[in-house]
């Protein structure tokens, strides 16, 4: 197995854990604001990455994808009980299990993009990007006001 892939699989769980968000000392308004800012980052990184997926510039794509993974991992932590509001549907807190599955699928699709980048596989990169984008739409259909 390629040494890059081995390192990738060792580092990804560590990186995901290291992106913990400290929201304990924040007001509901601050958490909602951070959540909305984080969603804006996710949208910006995804929009920036889309044209890059066809460029073959894997180092540049990797940089954006790492930022996207960080933002997505952080985003998952920004929905604690009692922070309902903004554009987030109350259904997030009512059906938390499904919401967490959707977010986990989104994060996994970003990790799959990283594997495509490491393999410099343009075809799987585009496929995984489309899966990631589809995961966004699925979650928004169910959970966005």
List each language-model region with its residue ranges.
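The canonical Cys-X-X-Cys-His
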Residues: 132-144
């Amino acid at each position: 197995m390629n040494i890059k892939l081995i390192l990738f699989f060792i580092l990804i769980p560590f990186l995901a854990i290291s992106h913990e968000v400290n929201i304990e000392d924040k007001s509901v308004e601050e958490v909602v604001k951070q959540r909305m800012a984080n969603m804006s980052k996710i949208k910006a990184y995804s929009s920036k990455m889309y044209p890059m997926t066809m460029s073959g510039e894997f180092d540049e794509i990797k940089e954006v994808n790492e930022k996207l993974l960080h933002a997505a991992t952080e985003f998952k932590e920004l929905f604690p009980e009692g922070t309902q509001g903004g554009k987030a549907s109350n259904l997030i807190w009512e059906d938390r299990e499904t919401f967490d599955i959707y977010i986990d699928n989104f994060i996994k699709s970003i990790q799959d993009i990283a594997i495509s980048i490491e393999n410099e596989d343009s075809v799987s990169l585009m496929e995984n990007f489309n899966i990631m984008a589809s995961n966004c739409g699925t979650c928004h259909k169910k959970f966005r006001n």
